[in-house]
Amino acid sequence: MAQASKGPKSTSYDAYFENVQSRKMLPQSLQETLTAAFARIPVSSFPEVPGGKVIEIPADTSIGDAVRVLSESNIMSAPVRNPDIEYTTDWRERYLGIIDYAAIVLWVLETAGVAAAALSTGSAAAAGVGAGAAGTLGAIALGATGPAAIAGLTVAAVGAAVAGGLSAEKGMAKDAPTAADKLGEDFYKVILQEEPFKSTTVKSILKSYRWAPFIPVATDSSMLSVLLLLSKYRLRNVPVIETGNSSIRNFITQSAVIHGLERCKGRDWFDCISANPISKLGLPFMTPDEVVSVQSDELILEAFKKMKDNQIGGLPVVEGPKKQIVGSVSIRDIRFLLLKPELFSSFRVLTVKDFMNTIASAIPHTGKVIRPLTCKPDETLGSVIHALASNSVHRIYVVGDDNGVTGVITLRDVISCFIFEPPNFFDNYFGFAAQEMLGC
């Protein structure tokens, strides 16, 4: 029987991994031995999420309630469950995808932008923007301070609420990055009462703001399958389904794997690979021309648009023709836009540089823009892993002697250094259903 032709996503996955394998200058025997070892380790051996229970969000949950769940559970993302299916052994029927906090806040900003545009042209009805959205978010996005803004949420209320409310404001007095990482307890208290939040469900934005499919593995699956999904197949997290049951038992993220690798320091196989300079491993797996960056004088919304369009989580902020790095922004930094009401009211004209400076001014003792995480081509993979794990970040930028950005190393890239895909592993292990969901 003829083999089905591969789709564009499959070709992209293959091209990435083939590039990785061709650039790694490691003994083939070492790679085969290590890959075989990962293939024998069951997923059930990986540490469980804190508390031992994976938090799930029903698809008919409102955006406000979803944020409340994420906030109270201190997590950034959660599987979305189909509330219409109570009892089933088929995970395809039970789960619809994964929602994360950054996607929700991105939706908030885009909703505000649409409402503001509608208000500025007097065409809210024609644009299909509800009275709540236009009167509240739109007025705030335009910087209104009169009755229109007061009739909805006040500027201060939205700024504080979306940023994380009192928790974030208290955190700002200590450390701004920490504040941005705390979801805050008051966000949901405000948006539960306002449109379009209280009538918009998680299901309605799940498809448009989902960057990766929902592909679980079984508890008796191998860690190799998880590592391949998190690297070659570009997933950021992999749900673990209990065998014979559709319930999720664990939730393995790229970050968790990197922290796991960091704890392997001292083991022969890890030290053998991590002692190599990143250049010997072919890192970064891109050319300087392929780096997606943003100039410091561009609008901050353009930076977030580039992230969404390219499905990447962060960008280096550069200046000049040599692209000298002066900072970085990530999709999670959207929350910083909302830490201060004056930022939110002017976000449509705010430059990346002003955005970074405003954040820096709120950080005690320094008052300076936080230096982005960088490395040189001669640094070891071990030092890169340590930097990523200890700073809890998702990427590190490779720079030359002139501090110009020459590449980016992501968690996906690091995981790819330790494995390769055995022949026909994907076809034999995951089967057609997973191929279809991955878009292969």
Question: What are these regions, as identified by a protein language model?
Answer:
Residues M1-C440:
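Tandem CBS (Cystathionine beta-synthase) repeat/Bateman regulatory domains
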